[in-house]
A protein has these predicted regions:
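Short N-terminal strand-loop motif that marks the start
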Residues: 1-65, 120, 211, 320-323, ...
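N-terminal Rossmann-fold NAD(P) dinucleotide-binding loop
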Residues: 172-173
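Glycine-rich beta-strand-centered segment in the early N-terminal region that forms part
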Residues: 23-37, 50-94, 109-112, 129-131
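NAD(P)H dinucleotide-binding glycine-rich loop of Rossmann-like/cofactor-binding domains
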Residues: 88-166
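Glycine-rich phosphate-binding loop and adjacent beta-alpha segment
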Residues: 101-103, 182, 193, 199-200, ...
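Adenosine-nucleotide cofactor-binding segment
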Residues: 162-168, 180-243
Length: 335
């Protein structure tokens, strides 16, 4: 079988498509023929930063894939022919995240799924929603589950609440779709008017171009009558966090997810304390959360937004497109 491998720290163009032996599942494991992968920004920076991260070579990239079970080990309830989707963390079945969970991320700490056949623990996959194709299901493990986690904990968004979504990346697009089925209003920021129009078509209540309106937090306050939003899906990091704190209401929630504006910066904790804001770090989610999300997807017949589908042998192009940041929705690799 064939698998893409990170074999050096030389970036996307150094990825190698190599031959590997077809893996055999041990007890408690399943072998999955991958029909599709989707890529995340995290996958791109893992490849680009493989040397600095001291990644073992070779490493198969990607956390998100969907396909069909082709073999099972002893003690497994799944059957050959079952459709399944990978879980980002192999060992986060339920409950709180811990150090052992963090060490079980696919496509980084553990081998990823950009291969024709992969072996995963049975608890590291989840049945694919029947309403989705494998290409659509492959978009769920990271971006969709991150958005779901940010909107459901420490408590679920309530119908009628207002949620601020920063940017129009994969997490924010899924968050918009989930807010629509939850009955929540949204305010969306982006530097692209075209992408804002697309978010409006998905149900966004208000849109703000932060390039032409750099003090976008003041506009959010104006749109909410001065009270602020109930929740923020914060993907920017240090460059946007203080404005997010200003834009959220007293007693509101900020789901802190990304660092798209960088990894360094200073934050004044006083407004967080003064407004009794809950700031929750969000790093994808558990298999139990995934199951809850899939039920919502099935019930509402939600369809992930896919921008482009690339052939398996042209996987490098998918990462270059991710780096270009012109896409709206997910980038998928079809085996």
């Amino acid at each position: 079988m064939q698998a893409w491998e990170i074999i050096s720290g030389d970036g996307v163009d150094a990825l190698n498509l190599n031959e590997r032996e077809i893996p055999i599942p041990s007890p408690g494991q399943v072998r999955v023929r991958m029909n599709a992968n989707s890529i995340n920004y995290r996958d791109l920076i893992t490849i680009e930063g493989a040397g600095a991260r001291k990644l073992p070579f070779p490493t198969i990239p990607n956390s998100d894939g969907a396909g069909v079970v082709t073999a099972v080990g002893k003690g497994v309830k799944l059957k050959e022919g079952d459709r399944v989707t990978s879980c980002f963390f192999e060992e986060w079945t339920a409950g709180e995240i811990g150090a052992s969970v963090m060490a079980s991320a696919l496509g980084g700490a553990r081998q990823g799924v950009l291969a024709e056949e992969v072996v995963l623990p049975e608890h590291g996959v989840i049945p694919t929603p029947t309403s989705l194709t494998d290409e659509e299901a492959a978009t769920l493990p990271c971006a969709a589950l991150t958005a779901w986690h940010a909107l459901t904990l420490p408590r679920p968004v309530k119908a009628g609440e207002t949620v601020l979504l920063l940017g129009t990346g994969g997490v924010s697009v899924f968050a918009q779709q989930f807010c629509s089925i939850m009955g929540a209003q949204t305010i969306v920021t982006s530097s692209s008017d075209d992408k804002l129009k697309k978010m409006k078509a998905l149900g966004a209540s208000e849109i703000i171009n932060y390039q032409t309106n750099p003090e976008w937090d003041a506009i959010v306050l104006e749109l909410t009558g001065g009270s602020g939003v109930d929740r923020v899906v914060e993907v920017g990091g240090p460059g946007t966090f203080d404005r997010s704190v200003n834009a959220v209401r007293v007693g509101g929630i900020i789901g802190l997810i990304g660092v798209l504006t960088g990894v360094s910066g200073a934050t004044n904790p006083t407004p967080i304390m003064a407004k009794s804001v809950t700031v929750k770090g969000v790093y994808v989610g558990s298999r139990a959360m995934f199951a809850d999300m899939n039920r919502a997807i099935e019930t509402h017949k939600l369809k992930p937004v896919i921008d482009q589908i690339f052939d398996f042998k042209d996987a490098r192009s998918a990462y270059h497109t991710m780096r270009g940041a012109k896409h709206f929705g997910k980038l998928v690799i079809k085996m």
